[in-house]
Amino acid sequence: MIVDNSGDGRIAGWLQGRAAERLRSIRLDPPLGFAAAVNAGIDAAAGQVVILFDSGVDLTGDAVSPLVNVLSDPSVVVAGPYGLRGQGTPKEFAASRGPEVDAIEGYCMAFRRADAQALEGFDPRFQFYRIADIEFSFRLRDRGGRAVVVPNLPLEKHEHRLWEATDPKERQRLSKRNMYRFLDRWGNRPDLLVGLQGARRAHF
């Protein structure tokens, strides 16, 4: 399934010309914010597992089966190839190979559709994409599950197209707003940081 949130009639025509039984597309007209667009895809999905592939990712093989297999473990609530861990605080995150992490980046992100619907999907206040994936990962994990990195998937990651298409000052403003929104809810929840959990176990 492809969610067309571009507002570009040429893309809509291209997708319509490639419509097939195994390819469905949803056109959002007028375009919505990032989170609302993702939620439209989640609502329209038919499978038990939803895997988000950002337009900045190219598949070079079967990246689906390994992600579905990982989610057969009921303790795993979100998985993907690109993980993040808080650097001692929810205010700063860095890439991590895991295997257990604090959040999965939205470039490629797999989760159960039922879990997403129980949370009412991504927070629609995140109209810009930055931090929305981290916030969604935290809400999934807050229900008692784990975020897990699945390495070596056949993917090629490119620059994020929306990031490149947005004016630098504007993307900085939108990113800061999303981070403040995230911290309003999760800034006082260091218990969700995997690294700090490990430090506490080692200490005691």
Regions found by a protein language model. Give the residues of each.
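Acidic donor-binding segment of Leloir-type glycosyltransferases
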Residues: 1-27
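Acidic donor-diphosphate engagement hotspot in glycosyltransferases and nucleotidyltransferases
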Residues: 11, 38, 61-64
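Conserved donor NDP-sugar-binding/catalytic core segment of glycosyltransferases
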Residues: 58-93
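Glycine-rich, basic loop-to-helix element that forms the pyrophosphate-binding segment
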Residues: 28-45
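C-terminal, non-catalytic tails of nucleotide-sugar-dependent glycosyltransferases
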Residues: 77-81, 85-88, 97-99, 110, ...
